[in-house]
């Protein structure tokens, strides 16, 4: 009952909507040569993040270099991580030669971010509660 599929300009929808969503799926890129420029910006990703409900998730499918050797892939990754620093997972979808550094074929890069309370605690030799966590 609470599923909603929206077909309209993503950026405009996020500007106008005040709704929060449990799951937001971004899959607007068909190749690295057809990327809507306004959908790879800090401003756009901040709008997406603002529409994620507590305990919600944002799933992003980006087309780029699996080794992040191209400037485009590096800058998109930097942009996403600027807005979604933690907890963010990244996975290459499809076959990938981990030894390829330059000229690798583009692949789908899946990012998943969870809207959880941030926790910046770390384990140190003097403060290690890993056994209890």
Task: Map each language-model feature to its residues.
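Soluble small-group transferase modules, centered on the S-adenosyl donor enzyme superfamily
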Residues: 86-133
């Amino acid at each position: 009952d609470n599923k909603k599929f929206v077909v309209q300009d993503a950026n405009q929808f996020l500007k106008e909507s005040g709704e929060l969503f449990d799951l937001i799926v971004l899959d607007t890129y068909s190749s690295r040569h057809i990327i809507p420029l306004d959908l790879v910006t800090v401003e756009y990703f901040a709008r997406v993040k603002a529409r994620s409900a507590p305990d919600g998730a944002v799933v992003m499918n980006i087309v780029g270099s699996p080794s992040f050797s191209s400037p485009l892939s590096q800058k998109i990754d930097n942009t996403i991580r600027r807005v979604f620093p933690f907890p963010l997972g990244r996975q290459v979808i499809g076959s990938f030669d981990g030894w390829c550094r330059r000229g690798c074929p583009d692949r789908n890069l899946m990012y998943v971010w969870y809207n959880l309370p941030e926790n910046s605690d770390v384990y140190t030799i003097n403060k290690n509660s890993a056994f209890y966590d």
